[in-house]
Amino acid sequence: VPAKPRRKSPALWPRILLLAVLTVAAWLSWVVIIPVDLPQSPYKLTIGPNRTLGQVARSLADEGIIRNRNIMMLLGRAQGMDRKIKAGLYQFNGSVSMWNILQRLADGHPDEASLTVIEGWNFRQLRQAIDRNPDIVHEARDWSDAQLLQQLGLNDIRPEGLFFPSTYLFTPGSSDLELYRRAYATMQQKLEAAWAARKPDLPYHTPYELLIMASLVEKETSLDADRPLVAAVFVNRLNKGMRLQTDPSVIYGMGTAYQGNISKADLRRDTPYNTYTRNGLTPTPISLPGQAALEAAANPANSSALYFVAKGDGSSYFSETLEQHNQAVRKYILKKGSND
């Protein structure tokens, strides 16, 4: 009698199913929970405006930060992140899992970014700094200065000096226009305060003229203690009808022709900004003045000085007479030149 075929035990199928489930679970755990070492720390994930979850997942997968972009998209959509993902800069350190990334994006709190605007910069340098900042959305990069000012509601005015130098914190993904607006509004507030607190009988007719003076002071010295004295020299010269004769104004008027050195011919070459050939203040500011320069222009030192010369250590020597000034020039400039 032939033997009957043996039946497979019914208990084998649950085991196979359990093994399959455990295998999938282990794979999902590896994909979702097990961290990946980052290529650099901190790793910066920048998400621009209107970027989709799929685009973010693809970018992360291409860089090897996540192991499976489709799983990230499924999990993200299950949390509704395809509708509420927030633009910005997200920083991660050491190692990170897909789950860590999803939770950060779901929280929607990107790290802050910063833009530092230096005292004494000109408007061209400000634009370059904003254009180079990778955390800013660049709407105005290809606009002319006039187009940019028009978007800010400013017409028939030069941009120089209108933006306050400071460090601005912002949410990554912010528009460059927002940064320009903040810097302009801050300068207006600072200028109004300086104008309201100014000494009486200064030779400024408008806050804008005070701003021009502050920009000249800013370019002449970076030493806080000297700024009120420099402002006093300029105010005294204006009151006496003397020309300001400040080299930074000549350099500004030279534009791109300035290559690091200024000659006697440059001092004689007339431009609207040459305070050796023109009376009074320059037609516009020549830099972005900071708080100390604004305060110095509004409250110059009580001094009769009409001249100053750089001493070579960052400070200046101030003189009331031309004879004293010439002696200081011989001491600090000519003597130094002969020793070099």
Feature names for model-found ranges:
Residues 128, 132-139, 149-340:
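Bacterial extracytoplasmic/cell-wall-associated proteins, especially those involved in peptidoglycan
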Residues 16-19, 54, 204:
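Generic hydrophobic-segment detector
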Residues 2-42:
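N-terminal type II signal-anchor transmembrane helix
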Residues 27, 31-194:
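Signal peptide-directed extracytoplasmic domains
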